[in-house]
Structures are given as structure tokens and as C-alpha cells.
Amino acid sequence: MKASADASSPQETTPPLSLLLFVANRPGDEEETAAIQAHIQQLPSNFSFELKVVPIGEQPYLLEEYKLVATPALIKVRPEPRQTLAGRKLLQKVDYWWPRWQREVALGLQADMQKSAAEQSDCSMELSRLKDELFQLRQERDRLAEQLQFKDRIISLLAHELRNPLTAGGIALETLESNLQEESSQQLPIEDIQRLFHHARSQTQTMGQLITDLLLAARGPQDKLQIMARQLDLRQLCQETVEDVRLNFERKKQHFTTDIPLDLPLVYGDGDRIRQVLVNLLDNACKYTPEGGKIHLSAFHRMTQKVQVTVSDTGPGIPIEQQEKIFGETVRLDRDRAIEGYGIGLALCRQIIRMHYGQIWVDSQPGKGSCFHFTLPVYS
């Protein structure tokens, strides 16, 4: 491509080869200037170039700036370095340097392309790095959101669990208080008074454990519930737990029975945690079973070196499609709407039993009650 003596418009790309032709505008110089322009314009060029004619008379300060000693003079401004051709045989000098200038332009464009490619590569790497950082930040955001949700769920869950021992302990203390106001002939036997005191103390200990769990949960999901498993007399634990919740059944005139064999083997577990599971299952059975209904607690030794515990009731039952979902942390069934509580204690039960390498599940039919089962490993 060849350029005229006119300057390129601002919208056009700057030509890689830029030339200035300085002339003195003496009489007769017009023909020489035109001849030089015509000669340069017809030279073969693989690149666009611009040729500007600069009259020295109009801009004399350029003589000093470009250090000109004679005219006409041709200065290569771009590509750098700057080069000046002047004096006699100017056109021959132009013919000599023209191919070299073409090579300079080619090398410069190649270098620019390589630089551009390198810059694009750097930009791609930077973009990739920023994408990685964005991905990590999103992961961190999701992790923090999950921690907050976990904390809210577990605190709500454990706060709900506090209701059970608080209510049971309160009933025991109310009974003791009422007993003090009765006439001596109507007061409870000393054995019942001792049982009520033991019951209140046991519920207080349970609340202390739950408060510890609340403080632990406040630190986030990285601090899981602690299991201190050891040899455990499950039969005795069941009997103690039954005594803790018996008053709840009596208040609703429910028929509560047990079937726990004397030769039930010892299990491997955390007594406080298994007590939580038993209390939760028995409390749910009490809540969902109508007045005068039946609740049964049983345990037996399975052939798979597991002990299975079952809590059955004559409550409304659970639809088959909901029986797995009830162990979720936020699930609440239609039957739960009128019952106080969050309905999320079963999630804690499942977590505890799984940490004992056991299983927990439910068998139920709507209108026919529910049977909650869990297993624990036999101690060996």
C-alpha cells in the first residue's frame, strides 16, 4: 500500500513507516519536491507509509530540532531510530535505504506481534488466575454460609432438646413441692421422694450435657459432637431413662410397657448420648400418642452382634414416602404443626447412632402407629 503526501485521518491506523520531507520553498524547488514525492510513491512497499512535506520557511524551529544542515532532506521518523537523508543524490540514497527500511518495518511488526501474543498470554494467565481466585472465594463464601446454617440448625436442635429434661425436671420438682403441702397422711412414701429427687438431678445433668453441646456447636461444624464410647449396661440405662420420662406418660394416662431381657449383653456406647436418643424417641412417642394410648420399649440381642432397641406407639403413624425424610434436620410433617417443638431431634438421633456404627430407622403406617428402631454394637 502506498500513501499520499496527505496525513492519515485520525480513524486510520498509524502507518508503520513515517517520513518527513523538508523543503526550503525556493524558486524552482516545487518541481524537485514533486519529483521526490513521485519517486517515493512508486517505490515497492509491503506496508503502508506516510510522507509529509514540511516547508522550513513556515516552521524554522524544526531546523534545530532535527539538526538539518541542507534541504531538501528526508527524515525517517518511524520506525526508530530516526535517520536523515540529505544532500546530493538524495533519490539514490532513498533507493539504497528503502529495502532496509522495509526490513526494519517487518522486524518491528513481528516484534509487536510477539509482544502482543506475549501480552495476550499474560492476560490469559492473569484471567485464569482471577477465575481461580473467584472460584476459591465462592467456595469460601459457600463454606461460611454452610457453617452459619449448620450453627443455626444445631443450636435450634439442641435448644429443642433442652425442653425434654427441663419439662421432666420441672414436673418432678412440682410434685415434690405439692407433697410438702399435703397432710402427713397423704404425703408420698420416702422411696417415691428419693426417686423424684434422683429424677430431677438426672435431668439437670442432662441439661448440662446439652448446654455443653450448644457451646460446642457454636464453634461450627468442624467441632462435631463428642462420643465417649465404653462398656455400657443398656438394660440399666433403659430402666433409668424410663424413670426419667415416666411422669410424662402418667400425665397423659398412657399405658407404658417394657420388654428388656435380663440377659441383654453389654453394648459399646456413650451412655449420655444413648440416653439422648432414648429420651427423644420416648418423648416423641408421648407427644404423638393420644391420651390412653400405648407405648412400648423393647430390646433384644440380634444374631449380627448387635443389640436392637425399639420404641413403638399407637400414634397417627408416618406415610411411607416421609419415613426417610423425618431424619433430616429441617423436615417437619403435617402431623407436627399443632405440636410444640421443632421436629428436628431425629436428625441428632441419627448422627449419634451413626457415630456408634449403628443404624436407626422407622416402620410405620398411617393410622397404625410407629416403631422406631436403632442398633448398637455388642461389647466384646
Curated annotation (Swiss-Prot):
* Post-translational modification note: Autophosphorylates, probably on His-160.
Q: Which UniProt keywords apply?
A: ATP-binding, Biological rhythms, Kinase, Nucleotide-binding, Phosphoprotein, Transferase, Two-component regulatory system
> Which residues, renumbered to this chain, carry the PTM Phosphohistidine?
H160
Q: Name one GO molecular function term.
A: phosphorelay sensor kinase activity
GO cellular component, alphabetical, reads: plasma membrane
Q: InterPro entries from the entry?
A: HATPase_C_sf, His_kinase_dom, HisK_dim/P_dom, HisK_dim/P_sf, KaiB_domain, Kinase_SasA, Sig_transdc_His_kin-like_C, Thioredoxin-like_sf
Catalytic activity of the protein: ATP + protein L-histidine = ADP + protein N-phospho-L-histidine
Out of the domains of life, which is the source? Bacteria
All residue ranges annotated as the Histidine kinase domain in the record = 157-380
Q: Where is this region: KaiB-like domain, interacts with KaiC?
A: 20-101
E.C. number(s) listed in UniProt:
2.7.13.3
One GO term under biological process is:
circadian rhythm
Bridged cysteine pairs (disulfide)? none
The free-text domain remark for this protein reads: The N-terminus (residues 1-108) interacts with KaiC, while the C-terminus (109-380) autophosphorylates and is probably responsible for self-association. The N-terminal domain stimulates the C-terminus to autophosphorylate; KaiC does not stimulate autophosphorylation of the C-terminal domain.
Q: How does it assemble?
A: Homotrimer with a small amount of possible homohexamer; a protein fragment of 109-380 is also a homotrimer. Interacts with KaiC, probably as 1 SasA trimer:1 KaiC homohexamer; unphosphorylated SasA has the highest affinity. Homodimer. Binds to the B-loop in the CI domain of KaiC; SasA and KaiB(fs) compete to bind to the CI domain. Binds preferentially to doubly phosphorylated KaiC.
What's its job? Member of the two-component regulatory system SasA/RpaA involved in genome-wide circadian gene expression. One of several clock output pathways. Participates in the Kai clock protein complex, the main circadian regulator in cyanobacteria, via its interaction with KaiC. KaiC enhances the autophosphorylation activity of SasA, which then transfers its phosphate group to RpaA to activate it. In addition to its output function, recruits fold-shifted KaiB (KaiB(fs)) to KaiC to cooperatively form the KaiB(6):KaiC(6) complex (independent of SasA kinase activity).
Full protein name? Adaptive-response sensory kinase SasA
Which organism was this protein described from?
Thermosynechococcus vestitus (strain NIES-2133 / IAM M-273 / BP-1)
Q: What is the lineage of its organism?
A: Bacteria, Bacillati, Cyanobacteriota, Cyanophyceae, Acaryochloridales
